[in-house]
Amino acid sequence: MGLPWYRVHTVVLNDPGRLLSVHIMHTALVAGWAGSMALYELAVFDPSDPVLDPMWRQGMFVIPFMTRLGITNSWGGWSITGGTITNPGIWSYEGVAGAHIVFSGLCFLAAIWHWVYWDLEIFCDERTGKPSLDLPKIFGIHLFLSGVACFGFGAFHVTGLYGPGIWVSDPYGLTGKVQPVSPAWGAEGFDPFVPGGIASHHIAAGTLGILAGLFHLSVRPPQRLYKGLRMGNIETVLSSSIAAVFFAAFVVAGTMWYGSATTPIELFGPTRYQWDQGYFQQEIYRRISAGLAENLSLSEAWSKIPEKLAFYDYIGNNPAKGGLFRAGSMDNGDGIAIGWLGHPVFRDKEGRELFVRRMPTFFETFPVVLVDGDGIVRADVPFRRAESKYSVEQVGVTVEFYGGELNGVSYSDPATVKKYARRAQLGEIFELDRATLKSDGVFRSSPRGWFTFGHASFALLFFFGHIWHGARTLFRDVFAGIDPDLDAQVEFGAFQKLGDPTTKRQAV
């Protein structure tokens, strides 16, 4: 049977045994990829600096997902939060990866068994003697089992009743750790940034799934509904399954890109909106104001700012700055961050503090403009020196650093001042090592960007797939050109055709 590549799935159309086999093989491939990818990432991952070189800067993709579910230790003797450990236990990163690979191998063998032994009694309709599947019953079974898994995850794993809990952090991604989470049953449970909503929603959705599964196991669909939705056709199952998958893909693309409790910034990197809104900058200034109110000097106040918080306030960590098709991790772009140089404070010769206007997300280049506290432009780096009025040289701008490696150092040399003004456009200033990885200086996106792009793209494709297969199953008689209720002998081109009421027809 010479089938074109896009029609090969017809070989499992009326063969339940081999339909099961190919799905088990698909599970084997998915689990095998997950385990293998985890081992590859562990081989290249450097856990030595969780503050300035976290997993998302190194381009890790599956390690963040394991971590958010409660895995933090490695058989290599390190912990994701820093430091060393002596007894990581069986459920380390390597343990989870190994479990996926073993599971993949077992699924591979099961797929082969079901391909060879396809003609099982369980798939045979005792009334007709032909292979058939009771699809509404199978739907009920799957709904019930997925409901049990969903409820179990929310009630046991997330709450810590039997499991580690999940990754929980503060709003600024500084204190993250794995901990048990209590369900949030009030209105706060609908806040996407409240971890308790993860527990309560899984418990609620799982309960609903269990009840719905039992309903579909005990109640048969009405005949009109069964026929109207083509519930006996396996392509109906394909269409509705694709709908479930693309809907989920759109949802997770949103929760990843806009941020939520399920996508902590310590594991996936900050969102672009945190740069756009000056989210971390505002928190830093709030802490500085609080420090000054406690009679600390500027230098002391800035020295108390966590390096982790300052690093989030850097445009190179904005996932929207990397192009969609620039391969590689963030470290391959602007380099590996080594240390925070400190916060530069610019002043003109009259002593006014000046603020460098920050680069918006979608600009590659941006004019260097310094404004005072009232937003009035006081200095810039001009494009045409002949027409300049506010150049650094003319205004006499100086820069002094507070906190970081250059704490207390000041510069009045215009070339140096301009250098740091340009760098201040990009947020807090860091020393970056571009030699080790031969980084090219062009920003890359974080796993947050890749995940969003991949899931949004495939969701769109799967949406079209849902429409396609839904239309095929609902209008199969129209596409075939023959009425499914027709039992008269027909000859193509001579007898009953679509829209020809004169041809012979005998209704059932």
Swiss-Prot record:
Major subcellular site: plastid
UniProt record, GO biological process: photosynthetic electron transport in photosystem II
Stretches that traverse the bilayer: 21-36, 101-115, 140-156, 203-218, 237-252, 457-472
Keyword check for Plastid: yes
Record's keyword annotation contains Plastid: yes
Keywords: Chlorophyll, Chloroplast, Chromophore, Membrane, Photosynthesis, Photosystem II, Plastid, Thylakoid, Transmembrane, Transmembrane helix
Entry GO terms, CC: chloroplast thylakoid membrane; photosystem II
Annotated localization: Plastid, Chloroplast thylakoid membrane
Domain of life, source organism: Eukaryota
Note on how the cofactor is bound: Binds multiple chlorophylls. PSII binds additional chlorophylls, carotenoids and specific lipids.
Entries under Pfam families matching the protein: PSII
HAMAP family: PSII_PsbB_CP47 (MF_01495)
Record family assignment: Belongs to the PsbB/PsbC family. PsbB subfamily.
Annotated function: One of the components of the core complex of photosystem II (PSII). It binds chlorophyll and helps catalyze the primary light-induced photochemical processes of PSII. PSII is a light-driven water:plastoquinone oxidoreductase, using light energy to abstract electrons from H(2)O, generating O(2) and a proton gradient subsequently used for ATP formation.
Protein name: Photosystem II CP47 reaction center protein
Organism annotation: Lemna minor (Common duckweed)
Lineage, opening ranks: Eukaryota, Viridiplantae, Streptophyta, Embryophyta, Tracheophyta
